[in-house]
Amino acid sequence: MQCPSCQNTDSRVLESRAADAGRSVRRRRECLHCDFRFTTYERVETVPITVLKRNGNRETFNRSKILNGLTLACQKTGLEQDRLESMVNELELQLQQRSGREVNSAEIGEMVLDQLSEMSEVAYVRFASVYRDFRGVNDFVAALEGIHANKEQLAAVR
């Protein structure tokens, strides 16, 4: 590994540990030439996921778009940014584990809404209003009724 300070390629690993819920390895290194200490991360290279948009266009999956949408939807709800990042990590992992490399944006939106419904009704409605393109109050009422119906079904199962 090349030292960021002196560009020497000789370094030793001081410490290694799992990071990002076991999906990467964090290594603390020391340059054998200048004694500079630095951190590296090792991850499995993944095959890109293609998202099929509503208008028929295809684009590479961009986790930051999901995270930005979640951050906006979750403002002033008390949900921590770390929790949102974990949610996006889990979503990306689920997409990577699928056999196909192409996914509809609608499927991604529904996966996000499923997780939000358990975390915050306010965030759910905010995200759904943009994702499902709400046009009026009736759309908001229908979304809230859907949340409550799902909660009642879960309570009946338990």
Swiss-Prot record:
Q: Which InterPro entries match?
A: ATP-cone_dom, NrdR-like_N, RNR_NrdR-like
Kindly state what the record says about how the cofactor is bound: Binds 1 zinc ion.
**A Gene Ontology MF term for this entry?**
ATP binding
The domain of life for this entry's organism is Bacteria
Q: Which UniProt keywords apply?
A: ATP-binding, DNA-binding, Metal-binding, Nucleotide-binding, Repressor, Transcription, Transcription regulation, Zinc, Zinc-finger
Q: Where are the zinc fingers (unnamed)?
A: 3-34
* Residues in coiled coil: none
Instruction: Domain (ATP-cone): give its ranges.
Output: 49-139
Which cofactors, by name? Zn(2+)
Q: Which GO terms describe its biological process?
A: negative regulation of DNA-templated transcription
What Pfam families has UniProt attached to this entry?
ATP-cone (PF03477), Zn_ribbon_NrdR (PF22811)
Keyword Repeat appears in the UniProt entry? no
- UniProt cross-references to PANTHER family, sorted A to Z: TRANSCRIPTIONAL REPRESSOR NRDR
Q: Which family does it belong to?
A: Belongs to the NrdR family.
Per its database record, what is this protein's job?
A: Negatively regulates transcription of bacterial ribonucleotide reductase nrd genes and operons by binding to NrdR-boxes.
Task: Indicate what this protein is called per its UniProt record.
Answer: Transcriptional repressor NrdR
